[in-house]
Amino acid sequence: RGAASLAAVAGAGARETTTTPSAHRELADTIVGHQIACGTPRVSPDGRHVAWVVTRVDLKANTYRSQVWLAHADGSRPPRPLTAGEHRDGNPSWSPDGTWLAFTSGRSEKKGETTLHVLPIGSSGELRTLATMPDGVGHVRWSPDGRWVSFTSRTQDERYTKDSEAWMAPRKIETFFTRLNGEGFVFDRPQHVHVVPADGTAAPRNLTPGTAEHGGPEWLPDSSGLVTSAATHEGWDLDLATDLHLVPLHGEIRALTARTGSYGDPSPSPDGTRVAFIGYDDPLTYPQNARVGVLELATGRHRWVSDGLDRTFSTTSGSIAPVWTGAGELVAFAEDRGTARVWRLDATGATPPVALTGGRRIVKSFDVAGGVLAIAASQVDRPTEILTVVGGEERRLSAVGDELVRATAPLAWEHFTVPCGSPYAGGPAEIDAWIMRPRDFDPARRYPVLLNVHGGPHTQYGETYFDEAQVQAAAGFAVVMCNPRGSSGREQAWGQAILGRKHPVAPGTGWGDADVADVLAVLDAALARHAWCDPSRVGMLGGSYGGYMATMLAGLHGERFRAICSERAVNNMISEEWSSDIGTVFRVEHGPNHLDDAEEYARMSPIRHVRDISVPMLIIHSEEDLRCPMSQAEELFVAMRLLGKDVTFYRFPGETHELSRSGSPIHRAQRFEIILDFFARHLAA
């Protein structure tokens, strides 16, 4: 379907501002069905080639498919797929001589079973299968001597692998963090580090048996072992502390740090004397801007080398271990006010970081080898593509988004800043905000407005392709988004501005105070700046913390809105702490737990204001959500129903907290249709 055809689907006629239900369905199917993105770039050791992963939606089959692609780094030849893309292929990793590429595949019909393969590149040979693991394979790395391939995989307790739960043993629970959203129970299937001979002559060997989870394994330069991150201390479930560990191929695991902070994403130096990593020193305060550190193995001491840039090096897209490009230089990426850039850092911290990429876009992952920087980057009107940067010059290698652009004609943002809604002294007192004009925009008309609030709250909106905004704008809505206090991408004080009022280190306003003021300030500014935004037809929506904000605004400022959609929300802070898969970290964010300060948790809870809700509400929640459990939605729905409020509740079976991002394609399209129908009905002229 071409862009002109999509405009017809959007139905932006002379008298209509939003589309009809049948058009909503087709619009949702068109945009969801064309979703595609590149990721996980891997540069060959000599810098000549780049491998990456392309993931696309197959709407007809209601699934996702991914395949590994390969291109010359100089763009001299068109990229080509290395795998068929009929399954979920990923995690490419080069052999040290660049002649083999390891990758994973979900080709098995058994749920969770994943295979690890190596494929010859530029030479004769056949695909070789190294391992078949029952519970996933990730973080694939080739040892520097070429003899081993390492990976992570969950080790299952046989007591809980039976076909029928009636035969399973009862689970003995003694710690928090027993379950994880999207994974289910994890304490009885911890993630371990495995190695397998690269020639396939032996079975994989588990290097980290036991109850502790190990992540981010990276090889020492002499191939004698790996460095990982794990929480193995007493009371590990009561704080955010994680230590770096040395995991030898033979011998005992040894901690390299001593529970003084949260340290992860290790990267040993080329000479083996240091380990770069991402983290921070205080495991009892969150959020903090994650920094790049360098640990001296001889002394056990570390220094922070990114302090010249007060931004987080653990981005909304995730964190990636710093890459050494020499004995004294590192490359890492960090967020910056709605963008994410790659930076070069002095490994001593003597000079400030220098940006290697720029522009109004978000880099989502990167790799460096052989003098070539490869990035996976997205901008608002184009999905994530692969580019190389050599000598400051960029070259785009992939073009997988061409069909999406042709079929859906993505729209662009207008960025603007707004003064904070209440006093702020930690940095520039301004909020980054964006507005997207409706498709077929006519300045003489007035359009309904949808105010979006992101989750987290310690994440950011920004300069990247976002299907939510594209769908809403294509349906005829003006789309407003912002990064209020509490968001990431700014100085640490910005993120910590809404820490709990009694937090022992960095007390803030708590949730539901400065953040609310900022969101409303952005809405006021957008309406004042743009006469084509109709202030009498404003809707609001958000998910997770954004759902929290939606319910809070419904109770405190419902008169500002015609309708509000609250998705996967936190509605009751007290019950959220005792039921969420990560609820026990609330105290590092808010200070006391709910047992020590129930009054403050009640003050921050949107459910407290349910009697004051007068605006129609749509509640959307996933039945397998462990981050914000279904009970959060049920509490709000039951309360509103008992009070005779206007409320509609949709439950998505089999989905988790990630419904809007990686839920089944059919459910993602149905969700869009439900949201568009709701706001078209309530925001009609």
Question: Model-found features: residue ranges?
Answer:
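Predominantly five- to eight-bladed beta-propeller fold
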Residues: 15-20, 65-66, 154-196, 241-242, ...
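Asp-box/WD-like beta-propeller blade repeats and closely related beta-sheet repeat scaffolds
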Residues: 109-192
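Beta-strand-rich domains and repeat architectures in extracellular enzymes and scaffolds
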Residues: 30-66
